[in-house]
Amino acid sequence: MIEFNIKHQIFTSSGSKFLEVSEMIEKGSFIHISGDSGIGKTTFFKILAGIITPDFGFIKVNNSILLDTENRIFLPAQKRNISIMFQNYALFPNMTVKQNIAFAQKDKNPEIIDYYLEKFNLKILENVFPSKLSGGQQQRVALARTLVQNAEIILLDEPLSAVDASLRQSMMEEILKINPNQGSTIFMISHHARDSHNVSLNNLII
């Protein structure tokens, strides 16, 4: 069970707004995050991952407290079993495609790494550096690097926005396999959630 109650003020060039999110979610759920542009969906992800500390709130995962502002409890990002994919991909420029994916795989299991290289049509690019990749190719690498971590909670911020339509469905299928195979809870911000029609989506509006 994942439980959170978060309140956080966001400052923008046009003023400020309040992000307020409260929910209880069953482990292994697939959650589609929706809301107006600029409302704070990415900020919410950063709070879950431990990158940002909210003004007020708590986060509990299976009764373990990740965050409790009232009692000054904060589990650092590196100690949370959470993987996150940002819209800017954040690939390591001095690492090849394969090295970027392998870096995130703590067991360095070559079979798992090769699995995602094949499934995301990256095998032919495994020795290429990010600067030589298109936006869609970089996005596929970033998604593979996120999924290969086998995290308890997976946060995906527009993971398919730059991917060719011909690959989008197969990549969505790989995302959906994570649920039954390892029981991860997936939160996804995406305009392509309709491609996941074979799974029961829970919608969280921010």
Language model features: what each stretch is:
Residues 64-69, 110-126, 176-177:
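Conserved ABC ATPase "signature" region
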Residues 66-84:
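ABC ATPase NBD coupling module
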Residues 129-133, 137-139:
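Conserved ABC ATPase signature
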Residues 143:
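Hydrophobic anchor residue at the start of the ABC signature
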Residues 148-152:
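A short, proline-enriched helix->beta-strand linker immediately N-terminal to the Walker B motif
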Residues 154-158:
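Catalytic Walker B motif of ABC-type/P-loop ATPase nucleotide-binding domains
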Residues 183-190:
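Conserved H-loop
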